[in-house]
Amino acid sequence: MRKIFMDIETDALLDDMTCVHCIAIAINEDKPKAYGPDDLEEGVSEMLHADMLIGHNIIGFDYPALMKFGRTRLIKNFDATFRDTLICSRLLYPDLKEDDWRRMHSPARKEFPKDCYGRHSLKAWGYRLGHHKGKFLEETQDYGTYTEDMADYCKR
């Protein structure tokens, strides 16, 4: 089975978005590869060969974002099963606020930011699991320009 783990970076949220900057794809257990503005179509082509497409909020954001920018080959030729880890998180951990309350009142509390409390975001899960995605989104003010730092962030 060909599983593709994916993420995208854009210049804004869905309604205000004007471009997809990059797609990061990891096939099965391989290291992720980022496809920047000049080779987005190559990344989309890789996705067409997936049996399962896995990502955080791919149903609510990533897939609609790709469709918004004319990646109609995806809709016409896509047979893969979607595994949206945001939906999985909400289904598997409906009482996350209780778990986080205990986390916030434990010796590990200094490691868990208050803005992650009760959230199912990648940032929050990164802190819970000790795999921080990075601070690119927090530290940058310009999402309108593609950078290698953005590509590195997308691959995490």
Please state what every model-predicted region is.
Residues L14, D30-P37, M52-R156:
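Active-site-proximal helix-loop-helix substrate-binding element of RNase H-like nuclease domains
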Residues M1-C22:
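Entry/capping segment at the start of metal-dependent catalytic domains
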Residues A26-N28:
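A generic structural motif
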Residues C22-A24, A34:
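Ordered hydrophobic segments in well-structured contexts
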Residues M1, H49-D51:
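A general structural motif
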Residues L40-M47:
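Short amphipathic alpha-helix with an adjacent loop that forms part of the alpha/beta core around
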